């Protein structure tokens, strides 16, 4: 079993943990419809960067 040779100082411990933070997802608001979607993804109503790229399914 691996055992550390020397005790890690609080500073080194903090530097080691500095990459463990959780990042928030990149969320954007579509300017044409105001809907929220992930960055670089099509909005639920078929818009991407202000242009209609997919026709929305008709709600029947």
Curated annotation (Swiss-Prot):
* GO terms of molecular function: structural constituent of ribosome
Which intervals of the chain are annotated as region Disordered? 1-28, 41-60
Q: Name one GO biological process term.
A: translation
Q: Name one GO cellular component term.
A: large ribosomal subunit
Q: Name one Pfam family in it.
A: Ribosomal_L32p
State if Ribosomal protein is listed as a keyword: yes
Q: Does the keyword tRNA-binding apply?
A: no
Instruction: Write out the entry's keywords from A to Z.
Output: Ribonucleoprotein, Ribosomal protein
Residue spans of biased composition, Basic residues class: 9-19
Give the family from UniProt.
Belongs to the bacterial ribosomal protein bL32 family.
Write down what this protein is called: Large ribosomal subunit protein bL32
Q: Which gene encodes it?
A: rpmF
């Amino acid at each position: 079993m691996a055992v550390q040779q020397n005790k890690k100082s609080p500073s080194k411990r903090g530097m080691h943990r500095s990459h463990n933070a959780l990042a928030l997802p990149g969320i954007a608001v579509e300017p044409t419809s105001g809907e929220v979607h992930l960055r670089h993804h099509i909005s639920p109503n078929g818009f991407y960067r202000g242009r209609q790229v997919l026709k929305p399914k008709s709600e029947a």
